[in-house]
């Protein structure tokens, strides 16, 4: 009855020593007692394979490979001792919730905290730690008077209340999984299990007090217990504790066992020290042996040769990093005879690498096993249950409904879900619209039109969806006993036929050979039912709001995981560094060696801080390590990772993450470079494999095909490529799988993305109206000037975005224009002059108009939610303020409002605007002028055109020159040319102006009077545009003008002339602009009707048309593609623009004159 220690650094053969001793016992038939090999839970499968390989099947007649948990299960099966079921983590959290609620009156420190999401899990972790470290209620009570820290005292006191109540309730129906080893300890003492057996304990770094108790019992009754320790001679002989020593955690574990041996009179057999021999793992590999010896040694010896078994790679990003690993693995397997099972890839942040490894390894045909448990939270069954609750919780929100439908378990066809989604988004269906008695009869559903077949189908789909959900909601809504809520969940799953669909999926997965999916979906059903059953057992009689129960259930789902066993033996193992021990690894790739990742940076302290743990340790309550200690323990994990491979090691780190943010290399990289000064750091630019082997890019079909594309691009651009690529091309061209893809390469190389021409006849059919006339609005022609292709898609092909129930900027524009028009009509009906309107009167009229509109249109979006009702009130303020400013502007001048919302350009009413194209084609322009003001002055009539804008719009001559801002000038030209028809007299231009609808915020460092505020508002909302260069007309727009105007963009000098900052033009310049714009419209129309739909968006300064275009995904404009270039709007000076405009008009007139003379 003794304990023997087996010492050895990493690679010295400690595990081999254990298996050899077991083999020796079996071969020599020394006795017939059991031989036990005790290893951590995650290593049992691999260790059994090792024994099978080293000893053979006959080993298992006497040998058992166990973990502590597996030992407990075996003992309970053979000797009894556990009659109750082990509670799941979810049930445990439910029980904690119940215990906290029942004792909430005694909890002051945790009272508010207990309502926060995740608190139950935090308490669960503390209780689990108490149990693993044998902290009983009595031991907590014993330290009550010893704690001087008031906060810690209260914290421990309340933890004791929860802990004690938890244990009492737990033992009524279940056993806590953390109590298993305590029960095992008792059962071992009561039984004769393992008497005279020999035990080898391998691969452990440390033991919990529970595990130490088991070791103590085994040591007392077994012939001998052998325990391996990964430690060097220096640390072994050092009796003082050094937290910075990489082997400190091992030394600490050894000391704990020595203490147990001393206290229990357990014999100490002479230890085996394997450090004195050449490391078994590194025989013949001096480089890896050098890492093991010197990476954590100070001082260290440099390795003065060129390393061949170590590679250091600096990756551009994670994708580049894993692709380099994939190339290396493929090369080693193909050229060096390695098996995939000899290779492992590890990192410290597996979640960041999981998906990218899956994609790239699939491309390279590399079989792999991801050593990570599957989280069930994203499983469709969990999603279905969660979203069923969320639909009730979030009142049938779009997100919750379609999360439910897209789980795939509802039985609704995907095509119907897509059609329903469009309908839901267009009509903003949520809340009462889902739950109304008969959807088909609802006003919002029928609208003003007929009940179409499509709507009938939508109503049927909605009914099929809502019936089981509403039945479920009726059962759980409000406060109910948990057992009734659980019954409702089960009945709902049966109603929706979930279990039948899952069974169908499992059959499909089996046919496709997706073993991991088969395992996941086979277990998820029983896991969910177990969670529901445990909820009934643990808190079944408790009455809870459905929302509170859903919170508890969600935390239960979040904690559920499924462990996966490898489905094949020859696979690359991928996992976390912490789980790499216990494997025979010949080749290891450590990826993601970045600062703060490896070694991992400091972790969260948890409910009990480092200071709390230190204080508790001083009074006899010893718990797990502090975060400071855990940081040093990371060094040991790093040591194990660096020394686990026997033949080859590759270290790599990315320089940037997926978002392009830079990442720093870990101190590991700099340390390796110092130990191996001749080690060359490779990268995508400097890849030794490619430099040494020109065929290094020919690997697996998919990555080689990707390289072929790059090479063909180089060849197309007249760059040098290796001659063998022509043979590679021939191979792919003759391969059935890649033949079509090869053809697409040539299409891609010659792809210019410029947009084909469309025939004139087709364009006429697309653009002409019912009377076969070509009618365009001025704003549409501006859009063509911005980008011909975008115009063609929107107005030629009639492409539209999916309708969404929201208030968009165009909706706001229409709403504002309608309200301003209604306001003008109201003022006219009441016979009130604009100049007589007060701010209060403006507010009153606008408020009444908006209220009436919302009352008349009950289904308006502005009536739908509190958010939109708030917006309606805000629009009242904005429009009222704007109307007040407009009234003030009109009151300051002599111009009178002539027309508002004036439609012109209809080919059937005087043909107000007609463009005669060069091929005798006629184009009719339509438009709507927001407001026309007129002034009779000295026998002349002047007109002022005003356009209301809800967004920022400035007058820009550059944009006029390029045809991007011609609306106001076209309107002006139409009015002047047709003034007799419209105004019964000839008119002259007075101004063309933009007015911004806004309620500006006035900022000031000093207190302001009402008059000063009003002046600042007028200044902020001053109209922008062009004004006739005539002092009489300007003063007729602002009779109060003194120096500068608060109404228009004009200001006077002291001598009465206009300042240079004034936006004023002469009547002749107005004529020139009108003529230029008229010709520009003709030019645009001719270009458009010629079939030119080139992809050429404009770019003004740093703003490109594409930034606001809804059709970018269609044209796929990319400046990297040949012929994809912006039409750059060059910002020229005002003088240059005028010179260019006049020059173009003169040239055009000369050309017309020559043509007329020739005729």
Swiss-Prot record:
GO biological process, one term: double-strand break repair via homologous recombination
InterPro entries: ADDB_N (IPR049035), DNA_helicase_suAddB (IPR014140), DNA_helicase_UvrD-like_C (IPR014017), P-loop_NTPase (IPR027417), PDDEXK-like_dom_sf (IPR011604), PDDEXK_AddAB-type (IPR038726), Restrct_endonuc-II-like (IPR011335)
Note accompanying the cofactor annotation: Binds 1 [4Fe-4S] cluster.
UniProt GO MF annotations: 4 iron, 4 sulfur cluster binding; 5'-3' exonuclease activity; ATP binding; double-stranded DNA binding; helicase activity; metal ion binding
Necessary cofactors: Mg(2+); [4Fe-4S] cluster
Residues holding ATP: 8-15
Annotated residues for binding of [4Fe-4S] cluster: 787, 1106, 1109, 1115
Gene3D superfamilies referenced in this protein's UniProt entry, alphabetically: 3.90.320.10, 6.10.140.1030, P-loop containing nucleotide triphosphate hydrolases
Boundaries of every UvrD-like helicase ATP-binding domain copy: 1-401
SUPFAM superfamilies in alphabetical order: P-loop containing nucleoside triphosphate hydrolases, Restriction endonuclease-like
Disulfide bond annotation, renumbered to this chain: none
Key words, A-Z: 4Fe-4S, ATP-binding, DNA damage, DNA repair, DNA-binding, Exonuclease, Helicase, Hydrolase, Iron, Iron-sulfur, Metal-binding, Nuclease, Nucleotide-binding
PANTHER family: RECBCD ENZYME SUBUNIT RECC (PTHR30591:SF1)
Record family assignment: Belongs to the helicase family. AddB/RexB type 1 subfamily.
Protein's name in the database: ATP-dependent helicase/deoxyribonuclease subunit B
Organism field: Clostridium beijerinckii (strain ATCC 51743 / NCIMB 8052)
Record lineage: Bacteria, Bacillati, Bacillota, Clostridia, Eubacteriales
